[in-house]
């Protein structure tokens, strides 16, 4: 009996050890696969100017595009080492789950069902948003509570559709859905008069309005009917890649807080601040802890910039979207951008 117990204990120990070994090999393999491939594959919105869109030459730009470039800069020291895959709302989750992309940075709301049921890991929030309504001014509507009976352009299988159902039910209103495949399709239907109103994240409405022939003929109603914390995500069980994606975002926020920009980053290498030195890899081992080089933070800021620079360049007041920082400002400037320190 004692011998049998010893055998069982040995098998259990070996089994536990094997599981751990396989897990470590899987984790290392996921990052190693990206390194051996030589570039990051990033899923983005196919057409959401300000966040992710292509110009006539096929070059991608936007807040989410910058984030993907930052991940590439952190891993490879080269922000161009990224391949973009344009995805619509229905394609994004199956594509991520299948492993055909490494990161999804596509204006995606962090929810419990996506976190738990779909087995994804959100790496943070890179844009705090809320759902609104875009209408033509000639409708002479001042409030979303006046939209009873409206034909509403809405993307199917999104949080926007669920929020819309809740809002209209709570206000004893009805609507006729006009389903669209994405922002490009929504704009076409809205501007042609096929629908009365387009509803999505307020940032998406600003992007749509900026693309109108005459933006002054379109207004975003004052009601914001939801919380939409948007951020990048990876598959669960992908700890190393998740850590790199998460700390890429944290580096960009911490750099802005520390006053490090893509223009002064070289000068900041000799700064006295210990925090600055850790961010830039002059001291500490932030990069190696993530499985990448010492210049992880330096390369991100040098090649892409801090979060504030990316925001201003892509969606800020001097862009067609003309968005204010609002909630997306640093915590010390009245916003909610607050991330863990580099220690």
Task: Please state what every model-predicted region is.
Residues 280-343:
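C-terminal functional modules
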Residues 12-15:
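C-terminal motif of bacterial Sec signal peptides marking the signal peptidase cleavage site
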Residues 41-50, 60-75, 129-185:
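Bilobed "Venus flytrap"/periplasmic-binding protein-like clamshell domains
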Residues 30, 67-68, 91-96, 183-189, ...:
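Short, hydrophobic alpha-helical packing/hinge segments within bilobed ligand-binding/sensory domains
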Residues 17-25, 66-69, 73-75, 138-141, ...:
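Extended ligand-binding regions for polar small-molecule ligands
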Residues 23-105, 330, 334:
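Extracytoplasmic small-molecule ligand-binding "clamshell" domains
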Residues 69, 73, 77-146, 203-224, ...:
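Acidic, polar ligand-binding/catalytic clefts
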Residues 2-8:
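Sec-dependent signal peptide recognition
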């Amino acid at each position: 009996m004692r011998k049998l117990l010893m055998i069982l204990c040995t098998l259990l120990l070996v089994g536990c050890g094997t599981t751990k070994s396989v897990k470590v090999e899987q984790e290392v393999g996921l990052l190693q696969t990206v390194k051996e491939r030589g570039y990051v594959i990033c899923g983005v919105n196919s057409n959401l100017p300000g966040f992710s869109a292509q110009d006539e030459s096929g070059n991608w730009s936007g807040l989410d595009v910058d984030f993907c470039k930052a991940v590439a800069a952190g891993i490879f020291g080269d922000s161009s080492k990224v391949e973009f895959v344009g995805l619509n709302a229905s394609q994004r989750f199956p594509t991520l789950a299948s492993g055909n992309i490494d990161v999804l940075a596509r204006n995606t709301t962090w929810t419990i069902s996506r976190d738990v049921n779909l087995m994804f890991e959100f790496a943070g929030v890179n844009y705090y948003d809320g759902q609104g309504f875009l209408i033509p001014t000639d409708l002479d509507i001042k409030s979303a509570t006046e939209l009873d009976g409206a034909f509403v352009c809405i993307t199917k299988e999104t949080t926007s559709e669920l929020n819309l159902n809740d809002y209209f039910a709570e206000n004893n209103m009805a609507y006729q859905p006009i389903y669209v495949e994405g922002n490009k399709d929504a704009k076409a239907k809205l501007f042609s008069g096929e629908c009365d109103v387009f509803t999505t994240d307020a940032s998406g409405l600003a992007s749509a309005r900026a693309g109108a022939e005459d933006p002054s003929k379109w207004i975003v109603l004052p009601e914001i009917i939801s919380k939409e914390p948007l951020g990048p995500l990876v598959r669960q069980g992908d700890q190393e890649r998740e850590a790199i994606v998460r700390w890429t975002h944290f580096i960009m926020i911490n750099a802005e807080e520390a006053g490090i920009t893509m223009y002064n980053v070289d000068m900041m290498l000799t700064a006295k601040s210990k925090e600055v030195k850790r961010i830039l890899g002059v001291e500490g081992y932030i990069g190696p802890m993530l499985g990448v080089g010492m210049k992880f933070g330096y390369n991100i800021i040098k090649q892409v910039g801090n979060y504030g620079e990316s925001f201003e360049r892509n969606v800020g007041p001097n862009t067609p979207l003309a968005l204010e920082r609002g909630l997306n400002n640093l915590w010390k400037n009245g916003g909610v951008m607050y991330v863990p320190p580099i220690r």
